[in-house]
Amino acid sequence: MQYTEGQLGRVFVVRIDDGEDMLVTLRQFIQDKGVQAGSIVFIGALKEGRMVTGPEEPVYPPVPHFVMFEGGWEVFGVGTIVPDKDGPHIHYHASVGRAGTALTGCLRETAVTYLVIEAVIYEITGLSARREFDEKTQLELTVLGNPGEGEKDGEAGPEEKEEHPALPEEKKEEKSELPGGLADIIRDLTRRPPT
């Protein structure tokens, strides 16, 4: 396991209209706004797209199983934004459904909007994260923490430590109500002063 910690930065709400490729539109928007790391959630519909629905066989390196879909498909999904050598890289996963058929996987290459898609982009600042090529999987994977950080004298870097600093008692109680980082994000959003 690896981890890194950051802070919630800007939040953008984006409407993508009929005929626009969601992948192209969001990539351009993220580059234009200078978002280097964050997450995306989106809902709406697609008229066509291409997705990887798992590997052909569960072997290393994986051979992706591509599926094309066309027509009006409802969609909801999430994405992560992590920098690579060329700037912000977006990794999308989504579920699409139409008339009792559903697909779930990694959106790739094209995702053309039908009617509208609404997306919310959460910028995360202060992260130590990057995408790097992984020899075993032959994929660009997210690596968390700074290269070489904490590796001298056999110590694990901060991203590999098992113990976490104690939280004040009030935060411990709040954190137990919701899983993982979701509680922290919701808490941060609800505590922000009005603008």
List each language-model region with its residue ranges.
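Intrinsically disordered, low-complexity terminal tails and inter-domain linkers enriched
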Residues: 151-176
